[in-house]
Design a protein with these regions (language model features):
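Intrinsically disordered, low-complexity N-terminal segments that are enriched in acidic
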Residues: 2-129
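Hydrophobic/aromatic-rich core segments of domains that either
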Residues: 3-4, 177, 209-298
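Alpha-helix N-cap/helix-initiation motif
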Residues: 21, 200-204, 242
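Short, hydrophobic/aromatic alpha-helical segments in well-folded domains
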Residues: 35, 157, 161, 195-199, ...
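Glycine-rich, small/acidic residue-mixed loop/short-helix segments
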Residues: 47-57, 62-65, 269-290, 294-303, ...
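Glycine-rich, flexible loop/turn motifs
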Residues: 76, 116, 181, 188-196, ...
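Secondary-structure boundary elements
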Residues: 119-205, 221, 284-286, 298-301, ...
Length: 312
């Protein structure tokens, strides 16, 4: 997926550096093409396509191209510290192309579940009275949000994993495994607006649904969990050629384990975080970190084509 011959000015240019010891180096290409039924006369877009730096992730290069070039483009960080780009398009257009290219290093060493030994009830109690800095920061992610409703059914679903005194890492991973084992990945079963309660009842959905479900279950117990958007490196079966553009955007979650410690969990695949996961942004739910959202004037018809290539 080559970038346009005359791309819009990149957010940042940097020469890729050698990967650190114990890190996997990736180049990620993300292409979004919007096709409209009529001319768009005015458009506002908010993009979460710029990866954030984390303790386990180092961004060594980032380029963004936009065609047609925006009339206004500004860059800043949102409430959660995620980089975001705001665009205004003032000229008529029937197609919008947004392409990014990311050079990034992801550490292979991750926090071990066995080290997350604080009993889950202790963390719940800390969040009830968040006097420590870590608890105060985490408390943002302990309550219901627009796309994550809480309730008794979700609490009841989580409780078999959260027996009395069980360490947070062990309990949260058990819940991750249960979602993976008991639910079916089905891209036709849900939409972006499907409530968490419906996902729990039907036991079908996609990565976004399963992340929201586990977040809702954890918060219903009084724990803190945040939604993470990013990319997943996929490996084709033996003997099968790798298809360029066939990698995927992905969603998972992080549960707060005390102080400044968070544990990534991927219920879609039933495993903890690994170097196969590349973080873009995190927030309370998908609505905080949607790759692209906004308002257009001029057409009620649009098609979106997305291609992702994770080369590691």
């Amino acid at each position: 997926m080559p970038l346009p011959a005359q791309p819009d000015s990149p957010i940042e240019r940097s020469t890729p550096k050698p990967a650190r010891d114990g890190a996997v180096r990736y180049r990620i290409r993300h292409s979004s093409a919007y096709h409209y039924g009529n001319d768009i006369m005015l458009a506002h877009h908010l993009l979460h396509l710029t990866p954030r730096a984390t303790p386990g992730q180092r961004v060594t290069g980032f380029r963004m191209s936009i065609d047609p070039p925006p009339s206004v483009k500004t860059e800043h960080r949102d409430y959660f510290g995620n980089p975001e780009v705001y665009l205004e398009m003032h000229e008529p257009h029937r197609k919008l192309s947004i392409q990014t290219e990311i050079d990034i290093e992801v550490a292979t060493a991750r926090p071990a579940i066995a080290t997350m030994t604080t009993p889950w009830e202790d963390l719940r109690d800390q969040l009830l009275h968040p006097s420590r800095p870590g608890a105060r920061a985490a408390s943002t992610f302990a309550y219901a949000s627009t796309m994550v409703a809480l309730g008794g059914a979700l609490r009841a679903f989580a409780l078999p994993s959260f027996t009395r005194g069980r360490p947070i890492g062990e309990a949260a991973m058990d819940l991750t495994n249960r979602i993976h084992d008991e639910f079916t990945f089905d891209a036709e079963a849900t939409t972006i607006a499907t409530p968490v309660g419906e996902v729990l009842e039907n036991k079908r959905g996609v990565c976004q649904d399963f992340a929201h479900l586990q977040i809702a279950a954890l918060r219903s117990l009084g724990l803190a969990a945040r939604y993470v958007s990013g990319y997943l490196r996929t490996i084709p079966p033996p003997g099968t050629a790798r298809v360029v553009g066939a990698d995927v955007s992905h969603a998972w979650l992080s549960v707060w384990c005390g102080e400044d410690r968070w544990l990534d969990l991927d219920p879609t695949n039933g495993r903890p975080g690994s170097s196969d996961l590349i973080t873009l942004a995190w927030g309370r739910d998908y609505g905080d970190v949607s790759p692209s959202q906004g308002v257009i004037i001029g057409s009620n018809e649009q098609d979106l084509e997305v291609k992702v290539d994770v080369d590691g």
